[in-house]
From Swiss-Prot:
Its EC number is 2.5.1.6. It holds the Pfam family AdoMet_Synthase. One of its GO terms (molecular function) is magnesium ion binding. Signal peptide: none annotated. HAMAP family: S_AdoMet_synth2. The keyword Cytoplasm does not apply. This is S-adenosylmethionine synthase. Belongs to the AdoMet synthase 2 family. ATP binds at residues 142-147. Pathway: Amino-acid biosynthesis; S-adenosyl-L-methionine biosynthesis; S-adenosyl-L-methionine from L-methionine: step 1/1. InterPro entries: AdoMet_synthase_2_family, AdoMet_synthase_3, S-AdoMet_synthetase_arc.
Amino acid sequence: MTDRNIQVQSLDRSAVEDDAVEIVERKGLGHPDSICDGIAEHVCETLAREYRDRVGHVLHFNTDETQLVAGDAAPAFGGGNVIDPIYILVVGRATSHYVEADGTEHHIPVESIALEAAREYLRETLPHLDLETDVIVDVKLGEGSGDLQDVFTDDDDGPAVPMANDTSFGVGHAPLTETERIVLEAERSLNGPYAEHTPAVGEDVKVMGKREDDHIDLTIAAALVDAHVPDMDAYIAQVEAIREHVFDLATEHTDREVTVHVNTADDYESGSIYLTTTGTSAEQGDDGSVGRGNRANGLITPNRAMSMEATSGKNPVNHIGKIYNLLSTQIAEAVVAEVDGIRDLRVRLLSQIGRPIDEPHVADVEVVTEDGTAVADVDAEIERIVDAQLASVTDLTRRVIDGERTTF
């Protein structure tokens, strides 16, 4: 054990699973906010790898201010068209000029790298989007603030662990409640295995879960793709198929009563339905920004403590807004996996600018235990796990750079 400031205490509330009302949301991959998150993070990973390959380590950068301005479209059964393209602006800071100690200079085309990474992400994630006509991607990356670059830069030999770039915090929790798990898995299924054999379902899928006592109510907003929907009957059939699929998935995770609603704003008589040309509402009136959607664990959970930091696009080496949100979630999951008798657990990590990121100002763990288990029975084991996770924080950075960790 080290002398890290790790606190373990009882959480002064019941487990979220016992709340009378629980609300959980997930914005799917094609939601405008998630598009921005995904582009920002893919650009982040690409820049980090490029720096590592060119100069041997990651330089100062952030791409967490990416914005999306919605376009205009005219969807129609059998196939419509985009009238005005979506506009995406990748915004941030990135080191484009680096001089090594021996005087070797590196000029890094950061905007070109970012542009190609953004287009690559769109190509892989939104297959119904024509990159030549349906979207404009722009990049504006300035140089970083000098004082933050100094915090980022290693000393002569380089510290074993980077210094925190900010005084900030991250929050994580575990285990997921039944409602949280269902909401997460429903979107992932609709944008994964289900979409593979049902091209009519677009990537813009939002899932809102509400649990009142033992009744889980799910509302799905699913953009359907007009080229694969020939008429209203086909549209209605697709909506019903989605409802049945999500219902079956939900009942695999719970014995509670489940109700599923899909595209509740539809008016079949007037023809007002959720039909798109590209599979995303970004084609028509729905703007997006990094950090307005899912938190680091992929969910929006108002029953839980949450950080308002945008995790996607932040530098994975020393940006606390990214590292501590991912690490606190990882710590919570590790504790629940290894320690018996825990019903609910919350982790809060607070940094102090200039201090090593493996030495938080405080690592606070709050626990709800099962009947028959006291916090005193498990606090030493929890502290050991937290200490080990903090000690290996640089491995988390590597996993993020290599695309092994999701941020939204």
